[in-house]
């Protein structure tokens, strides 16, 4: 069990710390420095194993250099050089068949609402009768 785990367990249980350890004064871990030292040593070993006077190229760096290269021109040349050998009438027929199939190609048909004839349910006689009853004339 590591010292850090043991310390955490003791903190959780609330047991008193060891008498020699001062609170908050822990020695910084040597792991990051050790890791960088080890990485430098392995890199130096790799350089030593190469041919005399030659520096080995990083495969990742080479890939990144080539990755930046644009393939637009190459692709355009390829597309323009490979001409279609299909007859134009066949392509027109295919285009005509495909044109109406998708929903986005179909025009939206708007249904116009029929206007109802604005008329009244009451007749002229009913209005006159109402007027006489309401206004008293």
UniProtKB/Swiss-Prot annotation:
List of residues that carry Citrulline: 7
Gene Ontology CC entries for this record: cytosol; nucleolus; nucleoplasm; small-subunit processome
GO MF entry, a single one: enzyme binding
Post-translational modification: Citrullinated by PADI4.
Keywords: Citrullination, Nucleus, Phosphoprotein
Modified residues (Phosphoserine): 84
PANTHER family named in the record: ACTIVE REGULATOR OF SIRT1
Role this protein plays: Part of the small subunit (SSU) processome, first precursor of the small eukaryotic ribosomal subunit. During the assembly of the SSU processome in the nucleolus, many ribosome biogenesis factors, an RNA chaperone and ribosomal proteins associate with the nascent pre-rRNA and work in concert to generate RNA folding, modifications, rearrangements and cleavage as well as targeted degradation of pre-ribosomal RNA by the RNA exosome. Acts as a chaperone that specifically mediates the integration of RPS19 in state post-A1. Direct regulator of SIRT1.
Family from the record: Belongs to the AROS family.
Protein's UniProt name: Active regulator of SIRT1
Gene responsible for this protein: RPS19BP1
């Amino acid at each position: 069990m590591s010292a850090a785990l043991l310390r955490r367990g003791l903190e959780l249980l609330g047991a008193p710390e060891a008498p020699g350890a001062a609170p908050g004064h822990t020695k910084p871990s040597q792991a990051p420095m050790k890791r960088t030292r080890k990485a430098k040593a392995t890199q130096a070993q790799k350089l030593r194993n190469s041919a005399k006077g030659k520096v080995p190229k990083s495969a990742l760096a080479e890939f990144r250099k080539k990755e930046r290269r644009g393939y637009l021109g190459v692709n355009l040349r390829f597309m323009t050089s490979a001409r279609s050998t299909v007859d134009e009438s066949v392509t027109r027929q295919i285009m005509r068949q495909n044109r109406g199939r998708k929903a986005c190609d179909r025009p939206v048909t708007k249904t116009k609402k029929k206007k109802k004839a604005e008329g009244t349910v009451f007749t002229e006689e009913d209005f006159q009768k109402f007027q006489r009853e309401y206004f008293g004339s």
